[in-house]
Amino acid sequence: MNPPNPVARAFNAEEVIALLNEIAQPLAAERVTLEAAAGRVLREPVCAPEDQPPFDRSAVDGFVVRLDDAGSEFQIVDEIRAGDWKPRQLQRGETVRISTGGALPGEQLQVVMKEDVQTDGKTIRVTQRRQPGNIRFRGEDARAGQVLVESNTTLHPGTLALLASVGQAKPLVTRVPRVLHLATGNEIVAPEQTPERGQIRDSNSILVRSFLQPWQAGLEQTRLPEDETIAKTKLQTPNSKLQTADLLLISGGASVGEHDFTRSLLEHFGFEILVSKTSLRPGKPLIVARRGNQLAFGLPGNPLAHFVCLNLFVRVVLDKFSGCGNTELFQTGTLVAKLESDRNARETFWPARFELNHRQAELTPLRWSSSGDLTSLATANALLRVKAGGEDLAAGATVEFVPTNF
């Protein structure tokens, strides 16, 4: 008797996530301009090439005086603007007008704010000397060689500004993923078309495209006919992206119906099937496959199930591809309203709306009727986790959820 095929069993969410974290690997790194690096993951630490700031500089607009000169009246002998370099030895009774960011002309100095002096343009009279001396000292932000940005950091505007300030014009970042998305189903028509009887508009293609935007994926989308032979021929053409895609997403055809051929299509092109179904609701018909470093998902065609699988599983792979490590998907929050359980035998991911109240996530379950229900997704920004066969959840109960608008 042959042993049971482990792929044939239904995987739970944790098992699929653990598998994806194990098999997905960071993509290659490349050097790009700062403009192209926004949102990408840094693949090497960035160190300060010199002290930051590299010289003592004024933190205010004002006048430079000697620390050991306790006088109140001074003669203006020079002016230093930001970008000037004018070293000099100040004598007692002398001052230099200085702009914010200007390099101090020497050491053992103090900057008096312009608000604390009276001046006729040639001399000043100090009315108040505050401590400290309004100076940003050399190296007070970072010393030469100090790590400024760690590897595996996602680059946001503030980080990019720091890189620019230390001359890192071409940081080493993870390249963007190449994704091929195949939509299946003869009933699908373009959103701008009027469906005939038995047809529906394609909502999954824009769902996939918009979902991929945070990872800046290079996306190729095409439709496959509901004919396996024709589909295979189309994917074998020289211009097919199947050979170069890092990630293959197939919408629909992941179940076991007579016209569902996603699994056999993947096997035909040499993909090893790792998962053939899950114990989730919605999202039971899910396929996970691998060919070398390429990963593939056969996603359920129903939009809500599609949405759930993208946020639970495809997101994990994209984060691993980017180099930022394992994704911490689940967060905890509090239910605002009671959720009546239908005692379903499968773990359910329920569309919900969450808001932060005093740093605590509060979740409101949204109504949904089936895995094809799109109306709840218009306002959903979370998936509420409901355990299999669970009891009703009262308002105020602590629950797990996955944020979806990130």
Identify what each model region corresponds to.
Residues 1, 6-13, 171-299, 303-309:
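Helix-rich terminal scaffold detector
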Residues 2-11, 19, 64-221, 367-368, ...:
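Short, glycine/charged-enriched hinge/interface segments at domain edges or termini
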Residues 7-74, 154-155, 349:
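Intrinsically disordered, low-complexity, positively charged segments
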Residues 9-17, 30, 34, 56, ...:
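Generic structural signal for well-ordered, non-membrane alpha-helical segments
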Residues 14-17, 30-35, 39, 44, ...:
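Flexible glycine/proline-rich
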Residues 30-34, 52-74, 107-121, 353-377:
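Short beta-strand/loop turn elements enriched in aromatics
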Residues 56-58, 67-69, 87-91, 104-106, ...:
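Solvent-exposed alpha-helices and their adjacent loops that cap or buttress functional pockets
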